[in-house]
Amino acid sequence: MNLYNNQCPVPLEQQPVNEYNSLKNSWFFCWPTLSSHSYNKKITITLIATCFLVSPVLLSIFPIAKLPLKFFFSEFIISSLITCFILIRLYLGWSYVVKRLMSATVFYEESGWYDGQIWVKPSEILVKDRFIGLYEVFPLLNKIKNTLSCLSLMTTAPAILFFYF
């Protein structure tokens, strides 16, 4: 039984649980909900794809015959930065939803005329939303944070070595 239907004036697409479900079912934002193997595979494919995309530009800057190490280091650094931006977008989307799930009030607009209103969640809806936020969304945010940390650590060595070679 959906508790929102009976008690909630918030439009369906603006209800926190529906925002959570739409993120969970979207092509891009579902990445952290996948198993660790599938998630890491998607991140690795993204990293490799960005390597191929930045290669032509970097080949014009660092000829591979003359400066091979600079080319490979800069390729990895730029690809990692682009992947980090993608991960930051994932993090921001999920953090917005968890903020709305954990909040006792919901800001919404009925007509789209910037006449926002605030709805106070009843206790049973608040408990359900917080349960979803704590046990479903916070682990996803931690997964994204851990990925960002690992990627930034992996980028540190090539960034330092770039200036020595």
From Swiss-Prot:
Q: Does the keyword Chloroplast apply?
A: yes
- Predominant subcellular localization, coarse grouping: plastid
Protein localization: Plastid, Chloroplast
| Record-linked Pfam families | CGLD27-like
Q: Which GO terms describe its cellular component?
A: chloroplast
- From the UniProt record, list the coiled-coil ranges: none
**Does this entry carry the keyword Chloroplast?**
yes
Kindly state which keywords UniProt assigns to this record, in alphabetical order.
Chloroplast, Plastid
Cross-referenced InterPro entries, in alphabetical order? CGLD27-like
Q: Which cysteines are joined by disulfide bonds?
A: none
Give the family per the record: Belongs to the ycf36 family.
Which PANTHER family does this one have?
A: PROTEIN CONSERVED IN THE GREEN LINEAGE AND DIATOMS 27, CHLOROPLASTIC, PTHR34214
What's the protein called, per UniProt? Uncharacterized protein ycf36
